Amino acid sequence: MTYYISAKRFYFENKIKEGGYLAVVDGRFGDWSENVPEGAEVLDYSNYQIAPGLVDTHIHGFAGYDVMDNSEESLLGMSQALLSAGVTSFLPTALTAPFEELKAICQTTANTVGKETGAKIQGLFFEGPYFTETYKGAQNPIYMGNPRVEQLKAWQEAAQGKLIKLALAPEREGVAEFIQEATKQGVTIALGHSNATYEEAMAAVEAGASVWVHVYNGVRGFTHQKLLVS
């Protein structure tokens, strides 16, 4: 099935098109054109601007719903409400918590994927629990500890492979080995909530870490004399 959307303006990756029509073919966006075939079905959004949906890769809750509720209702509520903000995909993000609680969140998320009526769940993000206390922010230090591969495997099994991002502090013991194993499983490793030195941070990067969390906020600040995580 093919139909067309008319709009005031269309935003593409490297250009903007004024007016015209965007084809939708079997549920997927197609080509833009100035005109449409005679008799074509057209949805009129001429007072609106059309742009790609946003992807929120770090979100703990929205519209009164919280990932730590550990409920399908909350995840689906976030999914529907996020459309109002232009978000079409997201990573529900869990905070530092006990191992079993995080495992339960993995199971709930895995069971919810595919039931969304709004923004799609693209995977799960664990912000913790492998942080350190100095720059803990809102994270609960009681449940912080050194990274353990066996925990990751248990979480990943419960999540049916949906745990795709995890943030940790690079000064934790055993970080390099953990990062190497996690990245083999397709998990993106982020660095944050950390009091690490530059050398500790770079060792984590060399092991495979590739993303930062709360840079210039949840980490020790740098000076003209010493580079740090930031």
Q: How should each PLM-predicted stretch be described?
A:
Residues M1-A51:
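Histidine-rich, glycine-flanked metal-binding segment
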Residues H60, L76-I105, A119-T132, A159-E171, ...:
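Divalent metal-dependent hydrolysis catalytic cores, especially in the metallo-beta-lactamase
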Residues K8, L22, G27, N47, ...:
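Divalent metal-coordination and catalytic microenvironments
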